[in-house]
């Protein structure tokens, strides 16, 4: 359940915190040097193709009388009429008025008006946003805008690339056909007129379409070779799982602007992965789970493996490794000298299958037999649930010159059924560092393998369970540091993230087999997916960290001896930055992501001070929208629960009035190591709820979440949901006591892990604080989720049966104490299986619990997108929430006949007078 910070509105979707991609295979088809990446990142993120989406006008806050035609003028009796007639007219008018009043009152009840009403006047107001520093009056944010990506900042991705002779500051740009060419390499200095010493611009591909023989090819993704003479091109793209895909691959020649199939003998063979050798003379690729080598000097493809298939994967991860370990589609790593290829061999033969049904589409690609067209398509996924057999994964090597596959037995290795390989890193020419954990991810071993002598040894052991009772998060950010005696580095080494005094910090290990590090960072703060880059010439390590506050991200540098730590970004005010360095670290793309309007700039880091070379994005259109629309204000604060300081943000409606009573919606994710409260500029569904519906929206990152230290993070281990729900309830009770909060209208919602947390909070609270909840794609029993993720935080069910019982949603009587709750799920969710929601419904049925609504989305996976589902799920969330806070679910829970108006009035009266 990989959670990426770059996902569209996707803080709702996955379950684990974001992990960086490995730098060890930058020229593979898992890298970022792709046409699609560049094109998408040079436009507005997340723009959906469904421009026809046009929700009907929202009547929720329309006063009844505002929509009615004016009544006729009152009847004026003739003076010639008698007194009796006048009396009849008088009583008739009186009865007519009374009937009109009764009708208006009935309509008032039917409309479900509550004691709180956000009027159109109020929605035009706006107060200063404490996070963005802007003030505006304007229109409310609309749901259509949020879902269409209108509020997402415009962002440019730069694909840095090293020059053929090590030149720094080169980038790959992709654009439209014509002009400067479709795919081109530019020296960053040439972008602003400084041509001194630059390569200037060279065109790699003039057009996005080209011919291979008689066939016209439309480019989808590209990967230039390291020498920039060839381009690996992907066409006919087909998505597989979250990160993986297949397609047809072509080798495009830059000089002739012509192309040939990657495998001339099998041009239509769908390839899962392709990766350039470091010296540009060969491509290793995976097809049908087997590995092949294509040397450019030959038209023939050499098979590396032959027994790959349904249960045996070579060079690519299976479902669970792709989702929970590598966060990508590659399990292949070239050595720096191109003599060897390291790759994973994954044996799934003992892993049970889970069937995912599709009722409207056929993603398997199999054409049904005649007469069987009305049966659903079924994909059988090898999916290891908690406690079930895991795939057996081994590291193997291919000697390119000898055409030989071999493996290396290493002393002290984990047993086959207890091994998870989380990172492979080439160190110098023949040495490989391998980071592996046990099945429960609480023992870490680092192995050093010499592929020349075919020997290996364990060089580091970390007993995490003995250290703090926690776990190891998989990451691929370890950085090799080659020896350079002239620069004061007599031996090879590497930089890794380690636990130091309860926080994640950078450590430098040298030589490679030395288990005692030089600490580069220390303190009560944490590094984030570090290091970002290393300047080997000057001995500088660049990284992003939370040094100023858990909700912020700033860029820092430190010497390899741990001295002279200083920021590169302005730490005098809150900020959230991302940085991407050029290959030689002399240049970087600095992305300011909030709290004010995001911007991007190219910076030069060669000198003692950062120099801004060029601003490439300032988001002027977004700035204009902020001035036009009523943006909710954000109030950031800390809350201390059981001695732990936790981060919280309150989104207040425009023109917030502390003398009014507001409903409150809690939004949470809450997964281990995740973060939802941050200082990024964000206009999302929560912003819509505050701006348009006029509710307060609160988010608390409780215990278990990231960047607040290991003690607060690891306390949840073995008992997911307990402390997290306790923290949400405690915060909600605090809000219920505020003078401007309507404690009778409090709701909570979340997606994925947040869906689980919604149900767990409602279960633990039993209607004492929250009255409503909305859970999307929730886990309801951790025995149903995948083994690698679940056992990292819960141990195995065999080891911790009581913990699994406690973490499951089992107390139906407690759920019945809530006024009402909503559960929604994609019917074809390959991640959090529909089994979770169906099992919960069965428990509710057995307990005769009926105070819930449920909705399923056919053929939708975990993100719920199929056939307009993404719009529908948020529309349903919005409408359901309005009905909840307008008291509609109270009326549904206690219906009366229409002629019992007095009883209905008495029952509804408390809602209106509150």
UniProtKB/Swiss-Prot annotation:
Keywords assigned: Aminopeptidase, Glycoprotein, Hydrolase, Membrane, Protease, Serine protease, Signal-anchor, Transmembrane, Transmembrane helix, Vacuole
Assigned EC number: 3.4.14.5
Transmembrane segments: 90-110
GO terms for MF: aminopeptidase activity; dipeptidyl-peptidase activity; serine-type endopeptidase activity
Biased composition (Low complexity): 20-34
Topology feature Vacuolar, residues: 111-914
Active-site residues annotated for this sequence: 752, 829, 862
Composition-biased stretches (Acidic residues): 1-10
Top-rank taxon, per record: Eukaryota
GO CC annotation: fungal-type vacuole membrane; plasma membrane
Gene3D superfamilies: alpha/beta hydrolase, Dipeptidylpeptidase IV, N-terminal domain
Cytoplasmic side: 1-89
Region (Disordered): 1-81
Membrane association type: Single-pass type II membrane protein
Protein name: Probable dipeptidyl-aminopeptidase B
Organism: Aspergillus terreus (strain NIH 2624 / FGSC A1156)
């Amino acid at each position: 359940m990989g959670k990426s910070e770059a996902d569209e509105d996707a803080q709702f979707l996955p379950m684990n915190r974001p992990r960086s991609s490995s730098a060890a295979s930058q020229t593979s088809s898992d890298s970022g040097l792709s046409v699609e990446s560049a094109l998408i990142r040079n436009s507005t993120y997340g723009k959906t193709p469904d421009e026809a989406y046009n929700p009907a006008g929202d009547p929720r806050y329309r006063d009844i009388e505002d929509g009615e035609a004016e009544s006729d003028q009152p009847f004026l009796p003739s003076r010639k009429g008698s007194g009796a007639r006048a009396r009849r007219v008088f009583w008739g008018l009186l009865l007519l008025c009374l009937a009109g009043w009764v009708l208006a009152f009935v309509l008032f009840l039917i409309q479900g008006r509550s004691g709180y009403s956000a009027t159109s006047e109020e929605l035009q107001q706006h107060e200063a946003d404490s996070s963005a520093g802007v003030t505006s009056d304007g229109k409310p944010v609309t749901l259509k805008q949020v879902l269409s990506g209108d509020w997402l900042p415009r962002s440019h991705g730069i694909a840095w690339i090293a020059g053929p002779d090590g030149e720094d500051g080169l980038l790959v740009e992709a654009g439209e056909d014509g002009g400067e060419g479709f795919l081109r390499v530019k020296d960053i200095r040439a972008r602003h007129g400084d041509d001194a010493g630059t390569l200037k611009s060279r065109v790699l591909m003039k057009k996005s379409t080209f011919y291979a023989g008689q066939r016209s090819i439309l480019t989808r993704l590209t990967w230039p070779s390291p020498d920039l003479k060839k381009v690996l091109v992907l066409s006919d793209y087909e998505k597989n799982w979250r990160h993986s895909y297949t397609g047809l691959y072509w080798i495009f020649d830059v000089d002739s602007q012509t192309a040939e199939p990657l495998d001339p003998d099998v041009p239509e063979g769908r390839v899962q992965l392709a990766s350039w050798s470091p010296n540009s003379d060969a491509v290793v690729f995976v097809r049908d789970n087997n590995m092949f080598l294509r040397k450019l000097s030959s038209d023939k493809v050499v098979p590396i493996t032959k027994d790959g298939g349904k249960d045996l994967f070579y060079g690519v991860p299976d479902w669970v490794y792709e989702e929970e370990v590598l966060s990508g589609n590659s399990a292949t790593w070239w050595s720096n000298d191109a003599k060897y290829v390291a790759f994973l061999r994954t044996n799934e033969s003992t892993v049970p299958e889970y069937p995912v049904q599709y009722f409207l589409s056929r993603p398997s690609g199999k054409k049904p037999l005649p007469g069987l067209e009305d049966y659903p398509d079924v994909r059988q996924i090898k999916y290891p649930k908690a406690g079930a057999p895991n795939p057996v994964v081994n590291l193997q090597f291919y000697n390119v010159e000898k055409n030989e596959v071999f493996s290396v037995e290493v002393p002290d290795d984990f047993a086959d059924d207890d091994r998870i390989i989380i990172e492979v890193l080439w160190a110098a020419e023949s040495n490989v560092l391998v980071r592996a954990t046990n099945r429960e991810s609480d023992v870490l071993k680092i192995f050093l393998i010499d592929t020349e002598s075919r020997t290996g040894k364990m060089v580091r052991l970390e007993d995490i369970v003995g250290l703090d009772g926690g776990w190891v998060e998989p990451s691929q950010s370890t950085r090799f540091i080659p020896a350079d005696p002239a620069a004061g580095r007599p031996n090879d080494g590497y930089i890794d993230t380690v636990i130091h005094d309860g926080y994640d910090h950078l450590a430098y290990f040298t030589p490679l087999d030395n288990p005692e590090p030089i600490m580069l960072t220390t303190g009560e703060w944490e590094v984030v997916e570090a290091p970002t880059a290393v300047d080997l010439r000057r001995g500088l390590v660049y990284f992003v960290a939370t040094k100023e506050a858990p909700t912020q991200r700033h860029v820092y540098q430190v010497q390899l001896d741990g001295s002279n730590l200083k920021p590169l970004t302005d730490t005098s005010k809150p900020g959230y930055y991302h940085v991407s360095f050029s290959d030689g670290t002399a240049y970087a793309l600095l992305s300011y992501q909030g709290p004010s309007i995001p911007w991007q700039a190219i910076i030069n880091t060669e000198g003692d001070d950062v120099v801004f070379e060029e601003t490439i994005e300032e988001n002027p259109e977004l700035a204009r929208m902020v001035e036009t629309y009523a943006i909710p204000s954000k109030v950031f604060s800390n809350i201390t629960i059981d001695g732990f300081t936790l981060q919280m943000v309150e989104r207040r409606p425009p023109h917030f009035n502390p003398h009014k009573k507001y409903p409150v919606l809690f939004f949470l994710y809450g997964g281990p190591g995740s973060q939802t409260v941050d200082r990024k500029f964000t206009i999302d569904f929560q912003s819509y709820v505050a701006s348009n519906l006029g509710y307060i929206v609160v988010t608390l990152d409780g215990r278990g979440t990231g960047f607040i230290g290991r003690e607060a993070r690891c306390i949840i281990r073995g008992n997911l949901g307990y402390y997290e729900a306790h923290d949400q309830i405690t915060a909600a009770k605090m809000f219920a006591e505020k003078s401007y909060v309507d404690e009778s209208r409090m709701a909570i919602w979340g997606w994925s892990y947040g869906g689980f947390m919604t149900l767990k909070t409602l279960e633990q609270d039993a209607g004492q604080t929250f009255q409503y909840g909305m859970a999307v794609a929730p886990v309801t029993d951790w025995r149903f989720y995948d083994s690698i993720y679940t056992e990292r935080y819960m141990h195995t069910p065999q080891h911790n049966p009581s913990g699994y019982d406690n973490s499951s949603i089992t107390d139906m009587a407690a759920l019945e104490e809530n006024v009402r709750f909503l559960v929604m799920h994609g019917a074809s969710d390959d991640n959090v299986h529909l089994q979770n929601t169906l099992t919960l419904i069965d428990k509710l049925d057995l307990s005769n619990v009926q105070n819930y609504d449920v909705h399923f989305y056919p053929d939708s996976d975990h993100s719920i997108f199929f056939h307009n589902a993404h719009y529908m799920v948020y529309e349903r969330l919005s409408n359901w929430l309005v009905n909840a806070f307008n008291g509609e679910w109270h009326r549904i829970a206690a219906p009366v006949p229409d002629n019992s108006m007095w009883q209905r009035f008495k029952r509804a009266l408390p809602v209106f007078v509150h």
